Design a protein with these regions (language model features):
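Active-site neighborhood for divalent-cation/phosphate handling
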Residues: 97-203
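N-terminal phosphate-binding loop and adjacent alpha-helix
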Residues: 58-89
Length: 225
């Protein structure tokens, strides 16, 4: 049935990300961060000091040949994978476990309004009904996407709630995962770039003792503080 097809698809998506993310739950594992754009590859590795402060241990940036990525990163997998190997070696990063950010252009991000539901009702609606098809107009089949959602706010008076909807094409997720694996690395975490930046800012805001913090973006096109 159609409902069974949707449930199976949802289960497959959860399995794909569950297998990757569960590997990152081991506290003793080291993980390096990777950012790949059509112009460059950036890698970094952090560590925590005894007083629970983050320390930037290793970092490296490598420019890519635009002539070789003119058709996009995904179409240049082999070249990008080799360049990623060199970037990791230049930074002297030895861990194979990595977290990778996916460009915003590879994701659909929207805030949608839905009827007010409990968490359980929302989960059931996602698994058994065409909730996202009704709330979000996608050009492709929803089964081709990996979907993340988070409730932003509930309005009991209006009997509505706002939900953050994020969808990444499974083909893009698999392509970025393939590039990382071709470089001999193990992708344990994947997230959309704008959310990785927000998480970094949120973590910096939690630092005590009122230390001044800055969020710095270094790139070939975007450089901001």
């Amino acid at each position: 049935s159609e409902n069974k097809k949707k449930k199976d698809s949802f289960s497959n998506i959860k399995k794909i990300f569950g297998e990757r993310i569960s590997k990152a739950n081991v506290a003793t594992e080291e993980i390096a961060g990777i950012d790949i754009s059509e112009n460059s590859i950036k890698v970094a590795q952090l560590s925590k000091s005894k007083d629970d402060k983050w320390i930037l241990e290793k970092i490296s940036l490598r420019l890519l040949d635009k002539a070789k990525t003119i058709d996009g990163i995904i179409a240049s997998k082999d070249y990008v994978a080799e360049e990623l190997k060199l970037t990791m070696a230049n930074a002297k990063i030895t861990t194979s476990n990595v977290a990778i950010s996916i460009p915003v252009t590879s994701a659909i991000i929207r805030v949608v309004t839905s009827p007010l539901m409990t968490d359980e009702e929302l989960q059931k609606a996602i698994e058994t009904d065409s909730l996202w098809e009704n709330l979000v107009q996608l050009t492709d089949d929803l089964n081709e996407y990996s979907v993340f959602h988070q409730i932003i706010s509930r309005n009991p008076k209006g009997n509505t709630m706002e939900i953050l909807f994020v969808a990444s094409k499974l083909s893009d997720v698999n392509s970025y995962s393939s590039i990382v694996k071709k470089a001999g690395l193990n992708p344990v975490i994947m997230d959309v770039k704008c959310f990785t930046l927000k998480n970094a800012f949120d973590n910096a805001s939690k630092i005590e003792n009122k230390i001044n913090n800055a969020l710095l973006e270094i790139g070939t096109e975007d450089n901001y503080l």
